[in-house]
Amino acid sequence: MEVISASSLNPNAPMFVPLAYRTVEDFSDQWWNLVHSSPWFRDYWLRECFQDPQFQNDDAFDFDFDLDLQDEDEKERKEGKEVVSLGVLKWRSCGGGWAQAPRYVEKAPKFVKPKVSPRAIHQPR
């Protein structure tokens, strides 16, 4: 059997590289030697100088949002937080009497048979 390995893609097209990764700086040989030889410099550069292209818009995020929420939480804690036992209210309405079985009218039927009205089909001859 013959395997078809032809493709409709352009073989002469340049390789696709996303824009975020196209602007990579070309570092010198001295820099690469320093990164490989000095763990301190490698850690420093990754921690202080490296910027991941995925997280370029860090300025748009507000890191002080917790301070605003703390003020609102303190206000909410003081207002309307009285404890009410709902279980007591539920059992008071029972009355302590016997449980009543539901009446037949209230029960939903298990099987419902639709009432069919037979109609003659009139077809021309």
UniProtKB/Swiss-Prot annotation:
Molecular function in Gene Ontology: DNA binding
Membrane-spanning residues: none
Subcellular location: Nucleus
Induction and repression of expression: Induced by tunicamycin and osmotic stress.
UniProt keyword annotations, A-Z: DNA-binding, Nucleus, Stress response, Transcription, Transcription regulation
Taxonomy, superkingdom: Eukaryota
A single cellular component GO annotation: nucleus
Main location group: nucleus
The keyword Transcription regulation is assigned to this record: yes
GO annotation (BP), single: positive regulation of DNA-templated transcription
Signal peptide: none
Keyword RNA-binding listed: no
Its biological purpose: DNA-binding protein that binds to the NRP-B promoter to activate the NRP-B-mediated cell death response. Functions as an upstream component of stress-induced NRP-B-mediated signaling to connect stress in the endoplasmic reticulum (ER) to an osmotic stress-induced cell death signal. Exhibits transactivation activity in yeast.
Protein name: Protein EARLY RESPONSIVE TO DEHYDRATION 15
UniProt organism field: Glycine max
Gene assigned in the entry: ERD15
